Structures are given as structure tokens and as C-alpha cells.
Amino acid sequence: MNILNLKIIMFLLISNTIVVGGAWATSTCPDWPATRIAVEINALEQQLNKWSAAYHQQGHSPVTDDIYDQLQDKLRVWQSCRGLPDKTESQPIPGKGQFLHPVAHSGLKKLKDETALTRWMAGRKNLWVQPKVDGVAVTLVYHGGKLVQLLSRGNGVKGQNWTEKAPFISAIPQYIANAPALLTLQGELFLLMDGHQQAKSGGVNARSTVAGALMRKSPSPLLAQVGVFIWAWPDGPTTMKEKVALLQVMGFPFTAKYSEPVMSHLDVVQWRQFWFQAPLPFVTDGVVVRQEEEPAGRYWQATPGQWSMAWKYPPLQHIAEVKDIHFTLGRTGKGTVVLEVLPIKIDDKWIRRVNIGSVTRWKQWDIAPGDHITLALAGHGIPRLDNVVWRVHQRNTITAPNWDKFHQLSCFQRLPHGCEPQFLSRLIWLSGPGGLDIGGIGGGFWQELIHHELINDLVGWLLLTPEQIASIPGIGNARAEKIYQQFQRAKQQPFSRWLLALGFPQVVSVDAQWQVVLRRSLSEWATMAGIGQMRAKQIKHFLDHPDVQALADFLSTQKVVGFELTE
């Protein structure tokens, strides 16, 4: 047995796609030389900066927030592997703006989970929670009550001047009576929604829609559908209660309606879940917890402050890192590619392997170890590859095995050379629910039989004695006797199940006999309901194959139902 076949066989034995329960560490250091990890850190950092610039300068990004945040977490892991400090939160936002903000946009640091939230809230008082509105961050500047500037966030220090668009956004007051002589507000321009439920509908591309309307040279009719949520009033009233009350009087009602005092992390958990499910007038992607006490505006910087934190909703898209690529040969001789990924948890399932189909499809995806992919759960909880979101800079060449000689009628025996993977797949199918459904018999057991040369063809296990089965390490006499009895009872399985277990390409009636099936002509098969000419040819090729006929002859000697000779 060559090394490639051994790897394929061992992979088949452990190829449970989803593992429920338990946990594996996903934040591990890659097994790369120091020079390579430095290159990969630099490449990922540059890409994240480009996406960040697009997000803050243009209001949209080629990747979702979920993807960006998870790749940023990966960058942190890689940096820690080299002993580098975490600069992801303190790094200035890339890009340039022309107009200076009176007060810098500080941004938000993201809390990882409830434990991090509890830790941050400890020792702090006068805390409030708000929905994290998903829109375009702006600064509103009023002089003597008159709106004089509407600036995009830009890089947090300077932004673009959108003041000419403000008159078309009815949610923005153009004049505020009794306003402070100089009033600076920071907030979010968002797309007004009618009962949007984040848990059901997701982000619906709302932020990009607003950004596109703001960046058009001519005013867009869409601006009439834009609302504003004020989340910061630098150098404003010292209490949140007074802030939201005055904001409502000035014409900004959403802040008062969606700001709630909280005493513990459980209050935040409750509001986060409520807003995730409740119908809201805007798209959200989490909650923001902020304390009343803030530094004076002149001390704000374009990096996350410590007086407010974001706790985002669980990601809709999940990133997995490809650890290895395996090529498996199925019972019909078709090769498939399975990606081994660093384990990730989606819902309540741990994912560590993803079947992506044929070698051709794998080549189209251009996936190599180290790449990062997005996964989702399809029907029956089976993981599905959605996209490749990040490709490593250094790509190791992987050559797929040549499986041209394998087909639907190859490898009913362990030999000739190279047949082990397909033969094992045939045995796994035979004992599985699609075949004879022999309980407790799977790939590990069949591989032990092959390894100890106790089985050479697809039905040779019927000849095994309890003593032979018990000779396999780890199988005692009691279990060996149980397996032996299971094998003997399998002889009484319906004929149709036996045919399927052997690989017959069509279900037949239970009362059929092997010799009856064998005597049918090609034209007779073709005229049967649901078969047709192509399937009829497959059936005849199967029935006429000498290996299949040899199996049938053996089953006849074992008095297996349907295979007995009739006079």
C-alpha cells in the first residue's frame, strides 16, 4: 500500500464532517517559519487597511463586517504568535479627508463575548445601552443653531463635506432654536426601515445604499428616506438622561427612544436579544454600551475610547482556515476533495471538514492550505463552502491524484494495487444505511479487516468465524460473537437491499430474484418505469461484469435471500 492510498484510507476512517460537543482551540499559531508568518501578517494587514479605507471613505466594503472582524481577529492571533502588540484597535483609519472634524470620531472597540462585557462593566457606573445602528457615521456642526457642516467620518480626523446634501435629508434639522452657540453632534445616517427585524432579514445592504446616495453629485431622492441617530454629544450635558431629552427637543427623537439604562451585564444581554428580534426603524449589527462620564472633546482621538464599547451580534457568515486538503475516492470511483479546516462552531455544531465536490471544482476555487473560507450550514447541518475571502500570500502547490482508471465497476476486491480506497468506500456503503444497515460496523472495523488480511472482496466477511473476528485488537470474544451473528442475519436481508449494497444502480422489487434480474434484456430494462436507455445500459454493464457475477455466485453458496439457484 503506497503512502497516498494510506492517507486516503485513514482520512476515510475519521471523515465525520461534524462533531457535536467538545471544543477545539481555533486560535492557534500556524506552523510556518518566522519569515513566512511575517509576510502573511503584512499581506493581511494591508488588505484589512484597504477594506477599512473603503468602508470609512466610501461607505462600503468588498467584505461584510462579519468577515472583516473575523479576519482582524486572525491578524491579532498571528501578531501574538510573533510577540507583536495588538495594533488593530489603535491603528489610525487609513484614507484622507479634506475637512477637519471639530471633535475626532473615536470609534468603538468590540467586545468578544459576554465575559468581556462583564469585565468591562465591572467598576463602572451610570451605563446605558443603545442599538448599534448600521449606517454612515457623520458629524453635524451647528453655529448659532444653524447647520453649517455635515461631514463624513472619513479617517476620524478629517472627512468629506456633505453639507449640500443636508437640506434633502428631512431628518436633519437645518435650524435648532435655543441651541448652544457651538453644537457638535456625532451620529449615524441610516436607511429608514419599516419594522426591520435583524434576526430575520440581516443587513439588507442598507449602509451601502445610504453611502451611495450621499456620494452622488446630484441629490438622490433616496435622501428623503434617510434618518439620523445621534450617539455622541461631545462636551454636552453630563448625564445621559439630560442629553437624550435635549436631543429630542432639538429634533433627534431616536436617541431618546432607543437608549436604556443598565445595571448589569444581564440587562445588556436582554436588550441585545430584544433589539435583535424586535421590529426596528433601522438596520443594526449589535449594541453599544456607554458610560455617562466622558473626557472633554479636545481629548478625543481617532482611535477607540474606553468610555463606550460595541457588542456585535453573532456573525451570519463564519470564516474557517483551511488546514489541509484531502482527496477521497468514493465507491463509484468518483474522486472528491475534502477541506480540513481548523475547527469552528456554527450554531451548536463543530465543523472540521467540508466536502467541496470534484477536483475540477477545487481547481476552480483555487484553494490552498492557509486560505480562509466562509462556511454555512446547508440541509441536515452539512457544511457548505460559500466563498474564499482571503488567500495566503505563499501558496503551496498540491497535485491531485490520478484516478482515471477508477470507475463504477472497479475495485470490488482489495487488489489490484491502488484499489484500497474505493474498496473501503464500497464496504462502508455496504454496511451503512444505504446498504445492509449493519449496526456498529463502519470504516474503522472494515479497515482492521483489510489490514489483517481477513477480507479480500466485498462479501468475504460472510466466511469469517467468531475466532477470526476476535483476533482483531480491541475486539473481545463477546463483541466478536455479536458481530458474527449480525453477519449471519444479514443473509436474510431483502434481495433489494443486497443489490443496493453491492452497488446495483436501480432499486428493484423486493420479491425479485438474481436470475430473474439477470435474464432481463437491455430493451426490457429500458422500458421499465423510471429507468430509460442510459440507466438500462448501466444496469446491464453491472450485471454482466465478471466481478459482480462472481459475488452473486458466492452469495448463492451462502444461501443469501434472492441469490439461491432455482431449477
Swiss-Prot record:
It holds the Pfam family DNA_ligase_aden. It catalyses: NAD(+) + (deoxyribonucleotide)n-3'-hydroxyl + 5'-phospho-(deoxyribonucleotide)m = (deoxyribonucleotide)n+m + AMP + beta-nicotinamide D-nucleotide. Belongs to the NAD-dependent DNA ligase family. LigB subfamily. It comes from the Bacteria. Keywords: DNA damage, DNA repair, DNA replication, Ligase, NAD. Gene3D superfamilies: 5' to 3' exonuclease, C-terminal subdomain, DNA ligase/mRNA capping enzyme, Helix hairpin bin, Nucleic acid-binding proteins. Its EC number is 6.5.1.2. GO terms for molecular function: DNA ligase (NAD+) activity. GO terms for biological process: DNA repair; DNA replication. The active site is at K132 (n6-amp-lysine intermediate). It is an enzyme of class 6 (ligase). Catalyzes the formation of phosphodiester linkages between 5'-phosphoryl and 3'-hydroxyl groups in double-stranded DNA using NAD as a coenzyme and as the energy source for the reaction. This is DNA ligase B.
